């Protein structure tokens, strides 16, 4: 694809690749199911315990194992077939989801048992997500990589919109058991898609040496390039202070707005709907904007959205704040993700993405755990507002310390984005 052809269209052009389109569509359905479960788990845990500390603990136990397993999965995915790894992880995650459904319908579920199942699934998910991020790039040509990354982000965020919305309806009409079952069944689509697609040949890293040695090589590469280290630092802090707030949504719905399960699903869905809106914007105009500019807009918008959520006087305002948070987060996360993908060679890709995702996955549980505990000691609104203000301070620091985030604009692959200087 020529430079002129690439700039004449949008990122949606990559859906003309049959394998990418098939995998993308199946992933959208399956991840929608996963988000249904993600919403249903804290809902039932909070329903059983009425504790924000339990909410934070459940999120912590979900994300921490993924953070631990992710780097090892990245090392393995750089040395072995990523398609084969995904076939195994998707199968195990399907079995785990059916187990969660079975414990709930048989009435043996307890908060501890639910968290234990989620904890196990988190380890597998850590290997799955790092491999997934690298595998997607094998379904397109090298000069389409950035478009594929953007569409993959759009798919994840679309699922984040549809999943909570459907979960709210399902929880209201049929209960948590149906939400758990639909998620488990959705894995069949991804397994079928994996059997169908034929990825590009993979550039394998050296299969010798230890896993820790491979991880050290990946970390040295990250530390040697500000264009890699900066987005990894940013996504970790954003997860710690920004998106971790979403894990408190059941308490926000109940304690701040006094609404039920359907409205709770809509509150979380608003974040996803905002993210879908942002992903459409990114897919259509991002080639004409610097990643640094988009990231700056995103982190400031997310910070202000978190503050607005904490100050929201009514449910409708809270929904609007979540929409803004989702839109801003998508702008930021896509810029950071594509910034990393554009600056790493294929033989290092899974390891570097594992470090990136570990930063993200560490921030969410730590933030949720601390915020959940603080919310039991002080006002929930104060905790949320404080998180937003702290994130805004971090945004100012990175803007000043790293030349308005210009390292994000560096690239090893494809044409550089057209520079659109800021007005003024």
Which residue stretches match the model-derived regions?
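Alpha-helical transmembrane-bundle signature of multi-pass membrane transport and export proteins
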Residues: 1-424
């Amino acid at each position: 694809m020529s430079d002129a052809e690439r700039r004449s269209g949008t990122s949606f052009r990559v859906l003309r690749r049959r394998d990418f389109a098939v995998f993308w569509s199946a992933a959208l359905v399956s991840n929608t199911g996963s988000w249904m479960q993600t919403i249903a788990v804290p809902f039932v845990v909070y329903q059983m315990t009425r504790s924000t500390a339990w909410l934070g603990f459940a999120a912590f136990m979900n994300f921490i194992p993924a953070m631990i397993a992710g780097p090892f999965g990245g090392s393995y995915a750089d040395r072995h077939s990523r398609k084969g790894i995904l076939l195994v992880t998707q199968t195990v995650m399907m079995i785990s989801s059916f187990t969660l459904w079975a414990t709930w319908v048989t009435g043996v579920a307890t908060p501890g048992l639910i968290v234990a199942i989620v904890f196990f699934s988190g380890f597998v998910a850590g290997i799955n997500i790092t491999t997934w991020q690298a595998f997607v790039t094998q379904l397109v040509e090298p000069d389409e990589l950035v478009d594929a990354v953007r569409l993959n982000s759009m798919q994840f965020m679309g699922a984040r919109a549809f999943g909570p919305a459907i979960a709210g309806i399902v929880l209201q009409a049929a209960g948590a058991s149906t939400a758990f079952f639909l998620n488990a069944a959705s894995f069949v689509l991804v397994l079928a898609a994996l059997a169908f697609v034929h990825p590009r040949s993979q550039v394998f890293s050296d299969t010798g040496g230890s896993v820790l040695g491979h991880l050290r090589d990946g970390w040295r590469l990250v530390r040697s390039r500000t264009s890699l280290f900066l987005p990894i630092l940013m996504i970790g802090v954003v997860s710690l202070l920004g998106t971790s707030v979403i894990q408190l949504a059941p308490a926000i719905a109940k304690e701040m707005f006094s609404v039920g399960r359907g409205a709770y699903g809509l509150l979380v869905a608003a974040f996803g709907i905002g993210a879908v809106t942002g992903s459409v914007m990114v897919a259509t105009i991002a080639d004409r904007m610097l990643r640094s500019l988009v990231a700056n807009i995103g982190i400031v918008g997310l910070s202000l959205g978190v503050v607005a959520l904490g100050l929201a006087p009514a449910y409708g305002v809270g929904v609007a704040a979540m929409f803004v948070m989702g839109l801003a987060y998508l702008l930021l996360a896509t810029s950071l993700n594509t910034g990393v993908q554009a600056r790493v060679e294929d033989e290092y890709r899974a390891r570097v993405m594992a470090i990136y995702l570990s930063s993200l996955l560490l921030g969410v549980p730590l933030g949720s755990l601390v915020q959940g505990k603080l919310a039991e000691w002080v006002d929930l609104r104060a905790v949320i507002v404080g998180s937003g203000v702290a994130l805004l301070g971090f945004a100012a620091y990175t803007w000043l310390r790293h030349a308005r985030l210009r390292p994000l604009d560096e690239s090893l692959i494809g044409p550089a984005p057209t520079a659109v200087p800021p007005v003024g």
